[in-house]
């Protein structure tokens, strides 16, 4: 009572997915809250064309993906609220470019890595370009462009909320 999970359960009927999670894409008719056991108890997840899983946090609009058995809430960014409006989840404020790295149909607006001419550059972090062995090329030594950008965004937008963030496996 009084928790986000209690509100989700009070306002949604638990249903069995029409399609098999992990094996099939949800159908247009599938919009539900389902449950499954995880390592920490019962988790709840939204699946399909759900319209009531929006939540405001850190002056941004997020969509609830899952509530883990430990009570942690997994969110994805819906609207970055760069305009700073009072209600970032209002449909009038939906952003067409909220994603941190958005695919435009031909390119991403943020490069994964500005460097590209060596297979060392394929990781989130990378090692030494031109290295003669795999371990040196793929060591976690240097940050990719996307990791640097993501860390900057986190520091500017979420770092002050760190006490409310769960460090858990997605």
Regions found by a protein language model. Give the residues of each.
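Long, domain-scale functional regions
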Residues: 1-170
């Amino acid at each position: 009572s009084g928790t986000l999970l209690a509100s989700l359960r009070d306002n949604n009927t638990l249903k069995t997915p029409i399609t098999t999670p992990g094996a099939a894409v949800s159908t247009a008719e599938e919009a539900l809250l389902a449950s499954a056991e995880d390592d920490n108890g019962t988790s709840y997840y939204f699946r399909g064309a759900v319209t009531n899983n929006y939540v405001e946090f850190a002056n941004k609009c997020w969509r609830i993906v899952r509530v883990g058995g430990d009570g942690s809430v997994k969110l994805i960014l819906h609207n970055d609220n760069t305009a700073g409006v009072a209600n970032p989840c209002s449909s009038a404020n939906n952003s067409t470019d909220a994603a941190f790295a958005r695919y435009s149909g031909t390119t991403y607006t943020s490069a994964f890595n500005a460097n590209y001419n060596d297979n060392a550059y394929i990781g989130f972090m990378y090692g030494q370009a031109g290295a003669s062995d795999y371990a040196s090329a793929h060591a976690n030594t240097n940050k990719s462009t996307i990791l640097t950008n993501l860390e900057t965004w986190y520091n500017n937008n979420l770092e002050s909320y760190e006490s409310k963030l769960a460090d858990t496996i997605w």
